[in-house]
Amino acid sequence: MVSRIEDVAQAAGVSTATVSRALRGLPKVSDSTRAKVLKAAADLQYVASPTASSLASGKTHVVGVVVPYVTRWYFAHLISGASEVLREQGFHVLLFDVGDEGPHRALLLDSRMLFKRVDAVLILSLRLHDAERELLRRLNVPVVTVGVPDDDWPCVRIDDYETTRQATEHLIGLGHRHIGYVGGDTVPSMDFPTPADRARGFRETMQRHGLTVSAHSVVMGDWTAVSGREVGRELLARPDRPTAVVAASDELALGVLAAARELGLAVPADVSVIGIDDHEMADLNGLTTVAQPVVEQGRMATQLLLSAVAGHDLGHEVATVPTRLVVRSSTAAPPASAAAVAEPVRASAR
């Protein structure tokens, strides 16, 4: 027989209203009373009806999280940070993994969001289409984005341009003049701004120092270590290979490290490698990187979102989270022979 809230109230010796408040973690319930209610609910294996709770409060305590890829490192860590805050505050996650849905993406969101009501929506590193914007306006719930600034909603992000500027400046400061770049391809249906911003940070930093970026010193992968290994081999097997490589992510950089080993190149004696992110595997592999606090970005964005759910007006604030250079063993000065023939470097204007 399924237990009812009345059964819990009778067992705990309190009213049904007190049971409801105690189970929802609301104030004005003493610790001893809350403990009695929780014990009675556990003994009776009582499960509160989410439908009834939402009807009473007008809230579902569900937050929709829209993400392009669930399994990739960056997105998984954003979700981890968001889930941690939501769990602490008694909210549940409704995950929308849009993958490579392309033109069907808006339909996927529409069919799931409208029929499974959410109190707010968190958008993770995704530029929204017009149809998706209209859907969110119709839902009339708070929205916060991560990674992609938006004119309509608050955003938590890093400065992607700055990450590759920091990485490139580090290598130039060590004396490197012939620097290659391993970038991440843009998925057309996703329209990520990150690939272009990071590539621009590399190119413009090189230009400010008067250094050449040749066409064959830039290769593109798909953000994975496997891809980094493939394009890294292409870059490092050239007779005029670079003495250092900036990779647009740590996973790409880890692939470049593997490619260097396979080609018999010593890191950093023959080639220096730097990534971006501070992936857990970066430390294990001695990878120098520009670290970004991914889990913390997920936490910050979710805290903003719940503040909006509570009625606070957030405006269109953009919170830019700082990144930092973490120097490990994968970067050093170039070989003496390379340094001797290197082109002169201009001081950066920045």
Per-region residue spans from a language model:
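Short acidic capping loops at alpha-helix termini that bridge into adjacent secondary structure
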Residues: 177-178, 213-217, 267-272
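N-terminal helix-turn-helix DNA-binding module of bacterial transcription factors
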Residues: 1-61, 74, 335-350
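Periplasmic-binding protein-like
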Residues: 65, 115-124, 180-182, 218, ...
